[in-house]
Amino acid sequence: VPVLAAGGVATGRHVAAALALGAAGVWVGTAFLLTDENAAHLTEGEVEALVRSQATDTVISRAESGKPFRQTRSAWSEEWAAPGAPQPLGHPLHDVLVGDILGAIEEHDVKPLAHSGAGQGIGWFDRMRPVAEVMADLAGGAEAALDRLSAAHGPAQGAEQGRVPA
């Protein structure tokens, strides 16, 4: 059964590490947030929050929909996590409660409250780029890391037949 590695995969070295550990592939998410192709889905405030974020600037919050969601820290997530704040309702009730407010925050680009879903790999990205560049960096970085690994330790067992070791 093929296994995909997910979570924290942000660079070609991360891809290579997952493959070296036996994954058949990787699932990448955060690397594509700050891409030109995704720009239409982000406000200026969201882009600013993503660009300045490091791994420690993400939080798991239920303040968005009632379900746990990793996002960039904002005044919105901080207020919902503050002592004495009400507990978010479960999904979908919380979304009904705050959905219009979140829509207005996005529509009017209220920067202190702006946030975006993002994994802890967000710190690897500091600018908007085309998806083609992200893909080239992932593939090129993985290939270089796997070449270094192979040179240092020899090819993986089964690599000569083009198979990923089990």
Where are these regions (language model features)?
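Conserved active-site-proximal phosphate/metal-binding subdomains
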Residues: 2-4, 10-166
